A protein has these predicted regions:
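Conserved active-site and SAM-binding loop architecture
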Residues: 1-254
Length: 254
C-alpha cells in the first residue's frame, strides 16, 4: 500500500523521491502542491499520509519504532515559524500568520477520519498555546489526545531542541479531554544512544565547520551544505521514534 507525501519545497520533494527509491522510507507518491490545494479525494487509497513531509523523517521514525508501512497513520509537522522564538523579529503573527496551516490540515482530518495522527511543534509557551487550539479542534471530532515535551539530547543528540510531540487517536468513543503535557526524559532509552564520534560530527556541523567532516574539493563541500539544508528543517528521528513507541504502547494497552 502506498504512502502519500505532501511537500511544497521542490528540493525536499526530490529528497523524498530519492529516499523512496532507495527504500529508506515507505514507498509512495510525492505531491508538491500546497496543502491548501489538496482535497480529501486526493488521499483515497493511501495507507499513510505525511503532510509538511520535509525529507520524510516521520516515515523513517515510524519504521524505527516498529510501525509497519502497511499500518495506517497520518503525520504532520506544521510550520513552526508563527510560534517560534525566531518569530520575534516579525512580531509573532501567531494564529494570524499565513503559515499557520493546522486549520487546513484539520479540514482533511475531519473529512478523511484517519485512525491515528502524530504531529509536533516547537516546545515553547507559544507552542503550548498552539497545542491547546489543536486539541480543541481534534477533540471536537472525538479524538483522544496526548502530548509530551521531549528533548533531542535525551535521544542522544548533542543539542537540546525541545519539541512538543502529540498523538490523536480516533478509536475511542465520545469526547475525552487530552492528557496533561509532560516533560519526558529519553536518556534511559539505551538503543538510541549516540556515540561520541557522532556527537562530535554533529557539533561541528551545527557550528558550520565542515573542514573535519568532509573530504574533497569546494564543489563537493557545497553539495554537503545543500544536504545539511535538508537536515536543518527535519525532526530528530530517534526523538520521534521514542515518542511513537510510547504512544503506541499507551494506545494498545489502554
Amino acid at each position: 500500500m502506498a504512502a502519500y507525501y505532501n511537500e511544497i519545497d521542490p528540493y525536499a520533494a526530490q529528497w523524498l523521491r530519492n529516499l523512496i527509491s532507495a527504500g529508506h522510507i515507505a514507498a509512495g507518491d510525492v505531491d508538491e502542491r500546497s496543502i491548501e490545494d489538496v482535497r480529501p479525494d486526493d488521499l483515497r487509497g493511501y495507507t499513510q499520509c505525511h503532510f509538511f513531509a520535509g525529507i520524510g523523517v516521520w516515515s523513517f521514525a515510524l519504521r524505527m519504532a516498529g510501525w509497519d508501512d502497511s499500518r495506517p497513520v497520518w503525520t504532520g509537522s506544521c510550520p513552526c515559524q508563527p510560534f517560534s522564538i525566531a518569530a520575534v523579529a516579525h512580531e509573532r503573527a501567531g494564529f494570524d500568520d499565513s503559515r499557520h496551516l493546522f486549520p487546513t490540515w484539520f479540514d482533511l482530518i475531519r473529512e478523511c477520519r484517519p485512525v491515528v495522527c502524530f504531529g509536533e511543534q516547537v516546545g515553547s509557551r507559544d507552542g503550548l498555546t498552539w497545542l491547546d487550539s489543536v486539541f480543541d479542534h481534534l477533540e471536537s471530532e472525538s479524538y483522544a489526545c496526548a502530548a509530551a515535551i521531549t528533548s533531542a539530547a535525551g535521544a542522544g543528540a548533542d543539542h537540546i531542541r525541545n519539541r512538543l510531540y502529540f498523538v490523536a487517536n480516533s478509536m475511542r468513543t465520545g469526547r475525552q479531554r487530552h492528557q496533561p503535557i509532560e516533560r519526558v526524559s529519553l536518556a534511559a532509552q539505551a538503543p538510541f544512544a549516540e556515540s561520541r564520534n557522532a556527537a562530535a560530527r554533529l557539533r561541528a556541523l551545527m557550528a558550520g565547520d565542515y573542514s573535519g567532516l568532509l573530504s574533497g574539493d569546494e564543489p563537493s563541500i557545497a553539495v554537503e551544505r545543500c544536504r545539511a539544508r535538508g537536515y536543518g528543517n527535519a525532526i530528530n528521528a530517534r526523538q520521534a521514534a521514542i515518542f511513537i513507541e510510547c504512544a503506541d504502547e499507551a494506545m494498545t494497552h489502554h
